[in-house]
Amino acid sequence: MSASNLLPMISSNPAQFAQASLAKAFAPRVAQGQQSVLSFEAMLSTNMLDRIGPLASREDLLPPDAESTLEDLQKDPLALLPPHMRAAIESMDQTPQSAVAIDDHYVAPAPIQSSRITWNGGSLTKPELQIVAVLNRHKDLCPLSWESLEAKVNDPSTPPDLKAAIEALLQDPELFYAIGSQGDGRCGGKITAKDLSEFSKHHPQVAAFQESQAQSYAQNYIPSDSAENAQPSVMTENDALRELYRYSEYLPKNLSLADFKQIVDGEAKTGKCPPQVIAAAQYFVSHPEEWKRLYGGNIDKVHKEDFLEVASSSMSLTQAELDTLKTINSHQELFFGSGDLTRDKLASMADDKSLDPKVREAASQLLSDPLLFGLLNNAITGYKTHHGFFDFGGGHTVDSGNVSKEDFGRFYTNMTTANRTVQQPKFHVPETEAAQNAVADMKMGLADQPDIKSPKKNGGASCMSSTPCCG
């Protein structure tokens, strides 16, 4: 089940997400509701048969085709009713609506402990696995307290997939308790990012579910910086590099094949982790030789900063990014005449109707492109905040937010062949349910864009290398 399918399921079938804890609370009313429906149908059936019975014994009074009609009525006594009444009665027999309609918005006052599912055991339902998978994609918004969940649902800034998952979680206080009770089995009323990682580690079901999702994501990839109407394609190494670069602020300090598997399984210490990042991690899990080749063929585990150095010279830029660089290069006085290029300056240029439309378009594109901005911003400094054991004092700032004319010149003149090569993805139409669910999740990821990277002060001298991998 896709995260995009949670919301309509919640609105139409709220009881499907309610687990054993709510079943205890609602059991009397559920039984009563079901008994009422059954009694009503039994009464209706008996009443119909009482009327049909005498007629059935008087064959001489029946028209030629009545016998078959009566047999049909005995099988379906509702057939005599007008269509609107029949539809109303049949709708009563739908357990999710009849059983809990009056408590559609009921929320337990606190998480509920259960033996069905615990912090390190028990079996999760498929909807619960989907809830956990979505929560694992939003560890940056933890901790989540039980009391804050409804506010999160009503917060316009809450990503749509997380909103749907929280609405489902509100109907499953047992799952909340199990996640939030890591270590000692006692829930303090909140879920932390560490709780989610540990819960995922203790429940192999989560890893199996998320690995299946990740494989589908990698086969039905939509870039996180694409338009909403984009079509999916099979992820490439370049796609994986770009996604990991864009969301590097939320990745673990070290990256390896084992770390990527933890990202896929929900066990890693991550922040924002949309389906695009999960697909990137899965890509390298599935192609370990490509990961190692980035570092000469033998190295697996690297510092995140080392990855950024290599990725910056190994990834391809889009045609829009190359066009932006070309425009900036031919209008350097406009972009750098009054000093360094900042996001505020780009916003002002994008809104300045007196400027050439191409200049405004380039300013707008760079403003909305954290990947290209980062490449320019760190072209001279590189990404390492410490270059040696004895480095201290002075130095530079990584992700400073200020792009100098020298920064631009360094990157533009040292772009690699890979940087200048525009990739041509082969799009396809998702045909299976799994593929369609993956595409829906990918589009959910478009709403979870990376935040502006925070400046990081270096403790020592800046990187003096003139190679592209340092910028």
Swiss-Prot record:
Residues 448-471 are annotated as: Disordered. Keywords: Nodulation, Plasmid. Induction: By flavonoid signal compounds. The keyword Isomerase does not apply. InterPro entries: NolX. Regulates cultivar-specific nodulation of soybean. This is Nodulation protein NolX.
